[in-house]
């Protein structure tokens, strides 16, 4: 990730915040949505500068759809709204953590979280094959 390329879409994001962001080659940063009161990770979306600006100023999560090439506000179609409680950058300024109050399902499958269907390692499992322990 690099901080030099600017997104091709116009943005009203505060210049100081924009200068700190390290974006992918296509001008995006991953945005993790986390339930503010439980800490449960809900989903991963993508934001460009304008999506982050809209998220910071409207109190609702706005993402950039890589497949559709357009902005989408979580819940506008489904009713499964994400109300923003806080927004933070990670230590490298290449990922955004958005703590939200999720109404309904976060996942497009209808599940509350996108991270519950394909668990690769569970609590209590060491992750090390039995022969190697």
UniProtKB/Swiss-Prot annotation:
Subcellular location: Cytoplasm
NCBIfam families referenced in this protein's UniProt entry, alphabetically: PRK00051.1
Positions that bind Mg(2+): 90, 92, 94
Role of this protein: Catalyzes the hydrolysis of the adenine ring of phosphoribosyl-AMP.
Keyword annotations of the record: Amino-acid biosynthesis, Cytoplasm, Histidine biosynthesis, Hydrolase, Magnesium, Metal-binding, Zinc
One Gene Ontology term, aspect cellular component: cytoplasm
Required cofactor names: Mg(2+); Zn(2+)
Manner of cofactor binding, per the entry note: Binds 1 Mg(2+) ion per subunit.
Primary location: cytoplasm
One GO molecular-function entry: zinc ion binding
HAMAP family, A to Z: HisI (MF_01021)
Reactions performed catalytically: 1-(5-phospho-beta-D-ribosyl)-5'-AMP + H2O = 1-(5-phospho-beta-D-ribosyl)-5-[(5-phospho-beta-D-ribosylamino)methylideneamino]imidazole-4-carboxamide
Subunit note: Homodimer.
Entry EC number(s): 3.5.4.19
InterPro entries, sorted: PRA-CH, PRib_AMP_CycHydrolase_dom, PRib_AMP_CycHydrolase_sf
Gene that produces this protein: hisI
Name the record gives this protein: Phosphoribosyl-AMP cyclohydrolase
Residue positions binding Zn(2+): 91, 107, 114
GO biological process: L-histidine biosynthetic process
Organism the protein comes from: Streptomyces avermitilis (strain ATCC 31267 / DSM 46492 / JCM 5070 / NBRC 14893 / NCIMB 12804 / NRRL 8165 / MA-4680)
Family: Belongs to the PRA-CH family.
Any Pfam family hit: PRA-CH
Signal peptide: none
Top-level taxonomic group: Bacteria
Pathway: Amino-acid biosynthesis; L-histidine biosynthesis; L-histidine from 5-phospho-alpha-D-ribose 1-diphosphate: step 3/9
């Amino acid at each position: 990730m690099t901080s030099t390329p600017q997104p091709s879409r116009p943005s009203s994001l505060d210049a100081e915040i924009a200068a700190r962001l390290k974006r992918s080659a296509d001008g995006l940063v991953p945005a993790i949505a986390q339930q503010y009161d439980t800490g449960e990770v809900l989903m991963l979306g993508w934001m460009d500068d304008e999506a982050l600006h809209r998220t910071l100023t409207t109190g609702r999560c706005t993402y950039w759809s890589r497949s559709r090439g357009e902005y989408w506000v979580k819940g506008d179609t489904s009713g499964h709204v994400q109300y923003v409680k806080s927004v933070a950058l990670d230590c490298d300024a290449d990922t955004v953590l958005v703590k939200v109050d999720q109404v309904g399902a976060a996942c497009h499958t209808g599940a509350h979280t996108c991270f519950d269907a394909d668990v690769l390692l569970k609590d209590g499992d060491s992750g090390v094959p039995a022969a190697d322990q």
